[in-house]
Amino acid sequence: MLLRFTKMHGLGNDFMVLDLVSQHAHVQPKHVKLWGDRNTGVGFDQLLIVEAPSSPDVDFRYRIFNADGSEVEQCGNGARCFARFVQDKRLTVKKSIRVETKGGIIELNIRPDGQVTVDMGPPRLAPAEIPFQAEREALSYEIEVNGQRVELAAVSMGNPHGVLRVENVDSAPVHSLGPQLEVHPRFPKKANIGFLQVLDPHHARLRVWERGVGETQACGTGACAAAVAGIRQGWLQSPVQIDLPGGRLHIEWAGPGQPVMMTGPAVRVYEGQVRL
């Protein structure tokens, strides 16, 4: 059978989006890996699936698969594309929608200028909720990697993140340290690793090594986690502009217990069909 899909991106973080509300199919990891190959398939960082809600409290169910076939809890850039997709496909007429993810419920708001604001909910900072192995919650933790001590903050935005402050993201060891920290045993479910350069209290640069993907052009949850870590450490103040290789995100966070608000673009690239 043939399935219709839309290729989208948020700041260069690219997605294949499938509507499984009006189409019906059982997508398996082998399909995701086949479609995700940039040489022989569609090629993407993540596959986003739109499904009917499982409860009346939400409008849709939002599922996310990395290109390696693994299902993950959350994707912020994908959430913005999800919001644009369901409106463009007229699956909803609402400007504000609630969607259910593996990482919890998030709210998506489409602005008149076409940008999308995502209420990502409050960050989770307790080690057991991230999950991260530590005796107690702290602003930062020391991790040993190949005999070297690395200091990072641990934050969950529905998915686990480690955030390191660096002097310059251009020379940061993203491709050497990133994959080692991603699979570090203190992150039982692996982690996305952000390398944060603070420019001033309201402006920072970020590169992210994403779990199961590698470095991407942008990571929405990574930008949220970096802003939270920076604000908690006193390096940053809300609102924060986070510059990623693919572009800029606007992050607001009022402090503990408050939701993180992320605003940025969502772009449709093309429509296509794939064989299941």
Curated annotation (Swiss-Prot):
Keyword Cytoplasm: yes
Compartments, record wording: Cytoplasm
EC number: 5.1.1.7
Annotated residues for binding of substrate: 13, 46, 66, 76-77, 159, 192, 210-211, 220-221
Site (Important for dimerization): 270
Gene Ontology cellular component terms for the protein in this record: cytosol
InterPro entries tied to this protein: DAP_epimerase_AS (IPR018510), DAP_epimerase_DapF (IPR001653)
Gene: dapF
Species the sequence originates in: Pseudomonas paraeruginosa (strain DSM 24068 / PA7) (Pseudomonas aeruginosa (strain PA7))
GO process terms (BP): lysine biosynthetic process via diaminopimelate
Annotated PANTHER family: DIAMINOPIMELATE EPIMERASE (PTHR31689:SF0), DIAMINOPIMELATE EPIMERASE, CHLOROPLASTIC (PTHR31689)
Reaction(s) this enzyme catalyzes, per UniProt: (2S,6S)-2,6-diaminopimelate = meso-2,6-diaminopimelate
Known role: Catalyzes the stereoinversion of LL-2,6-diaminopimelate (L,L-DAP) to meso-diaminopimelate (meso-DAP), a precursor of L-lysine and an essential component of the bacterial peptidoglycan.
Gene Ontology MF, one: diaminopimelate epimerase activity
UniProt protein name: Diaminopimelate epimerase
